[in-house]
Amino acid sequence: MKPKLHFTAPYHWINDPNGLIYYKGNYHIFYQHFPYDNKWGTMHWGHAITKDFVNFEHLPIALYPSKDFDRNGCFSGSAIEIDGQLYLYYTAIKYAKENPSNVHNQYSDDDLRASQALVVSSDGIHFDNVKNKKQIIPMIQEAYLGDYRHTRDPKVWKKQDGKYAMVIGSKVAYENDYCGKALFYESEDGIHFEYKNSYQEPTIGNMWECPDVFKINDQYLELSEIDDD
């Protein structure tokens, strides 16, 4: 049985909500979705709209693997409106080695390759996964900056100065373990991003996922899901 109040996918697997935004008269809910089974697999972005958070209209899948850089999944991200268009930012996943027993799961943790990507839609309903995808931040190469396998979940917002900021969750080696880290980027147009700064805290988890940033009074608050595995 499906719950009556809690949002669910129309079928099969659902996890992280992504890209929650009010756009052109509707609240849009995107979410991590594997449309072929009731277990985690190659991630797509499911999509629904609502006006009251009680009645939902399910729409066609918004994002699905279609490029070499995201051939093994479209992981979590965020949405923002820029000049009337809807920008979806997500983590593109590619496996260095395919799993011969199940192509929908990585062979090992070391085989993940993560980069950041973008799709733009003019109506928030139709997303051209073939022509309109861009890899905007390639896989990290510098180990001191972040983990090339686990740098993900871009959150983008517009700053007061008109520029666009992005925060991405990651981790770096620390002593005999890992330390969670947030990477900060900046852009003039929401497409071309430049690395600006980072923050890490060894006492709070060994991986930070799904980061977000809020301004409260004169201070900024960074929130993340903490992975201690």
Residue ranges and their predicted role:
Residues M1-D153, W157-E209, K215-D229:
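Beta-rich carbohydrate-recognition and catalytic domains
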